């Protein structure tokens, strides 16, 4: 807190100083069973010094089989864990002591299967189906819709109370990628995903996560035209479309008292902003010269 912050109406919410380290040992082994089949296995672990959180054993497996004629199938799965945003550990009680030093890692189990087909002239198609179960997610002790699974979906920081690792959630979806590598002065890349993302806070109600737009589509392409002996004109474009971000109704009275945005638990993330759409066009000119 200083003269500049006082003039702007800012005040110190938390003031904490400390050090932390995240240690992540891992071992990975790849076995080429045959010319058509590969198998990858690994074990990951991590230790967070700030809270003494330990994840001693996170196995991860991957398998791929080439069926010939440019086709391949794959499958994989594994356990993962991650720390929380650093500032959330520094929540302070009225006596100044940090109140979230008992927070553990968020954890997840991932699985997926895929298929790909390569054609002549640099053209290929890939598709993948996946499922992720998220658990050990920090949520409030008192029943509410809050979950750390949604933190990071916006630009504001959340000054939450003490948290416990009892929340969970899941994601599942289907991805499709169609790609043509640059050949004969032309390329394109299409990727599309349809998915569902749900979570459960300490009130045990399933809700949309803030990221649950349900679909994302991207298209990128370009073409070059030779002009004369030394010049090239390029035309390219990119189109992105995605489902709108989820949101809820603001609790105006509580937000005013707390001096930050507090959402109502009822209907949280039931509402959705309009879908996102963006299109970009690029035109370029390139000239090759012996002196350049």
Listing of model-derived features with the role each one plays in the protein:
Residues 1, 41-47, 63, 75-79, ...:
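Transmembrane beta-barrel strands of outer-membrane/channel proteins
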Residues 13-24, 100, 104, 124-187:
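Outer membrane beta-barrel strand-and-loop segments of large Gram-negative receptors
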Residues 36, 131-133, 158-244:
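Gram-negative outer-membrane beta-barrel transporters
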Residues 36-39, 70-73, 121-125, 184-188, ...:
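Repeated loop/turn-to-beta-strand initiation elements of outer-membrane beta-barrel proteins
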